[in-house]
Structure formats: C-alpha cells, structure tokens
Curated annotation (Swiss-Prot):
Top-rank lineage group of the source organism: Archaea
GO cellular component, one term: plasma membrane
Transmembrane parts of this sequence: 34-53
GO biological process: protein transport
Originating gene: secG
Keyword Transport: yes
Location in or out of the cell: Cell membrane
Subunit-level organization: Component of the protein translocase complex. Heterotrimer consisting of alpha (SecY), beta (SecG) and gamma (SecE) subunits. Can form oligomers of the heterotrimer.
Protein name: Preprotein translocase subunit SecG
Extracellular side: 54-55
C-alpha cells in the first residue's frame, strides 16, 4: 500500500506539467535585469529625441 501512495506523489498533475517544464527552460536562457532593460529603453528614447531635434 505505501508503494502505490508513493507513486501517486511522484507523478505530477497534468495541469502542473507545463509549469514545471517552463521553469526548467527558464534556467537555460540569458537573464537580464529589469533595471538594465528600463535603462536601455530610456537611453534609446533620449538618443532618438536628440537626433530628431538636431535634424
């Protein structure tokens, strides 16, 4: 009886399988800090505004 209970606990629920798979894939990608993304977008915006004012 305990072995069947153990098997039920180790098998993931079908609705959770996608979340677990997504979490595993996330570790393989390059991580960029949100501060860097915001800073880069602000810098690009300022550069575009300055260039349009000059020309």
């Amino acid at each position: 009886m305990p072995s069947s209970k153990k098997k039920k606990e180790t098998v993931p629920v079908m609705s959770m399988a996608g979340l677990i798979r997504y979490y595993e894939e996330e570790n393989e990608k390059v991580k960029i800090s949100p501060k860097i993304v915001i800073g880069a977008s602000l810098a690009l915006t300022i550069i575009v505004i300055v260039i349009t004012k000059l020309f």
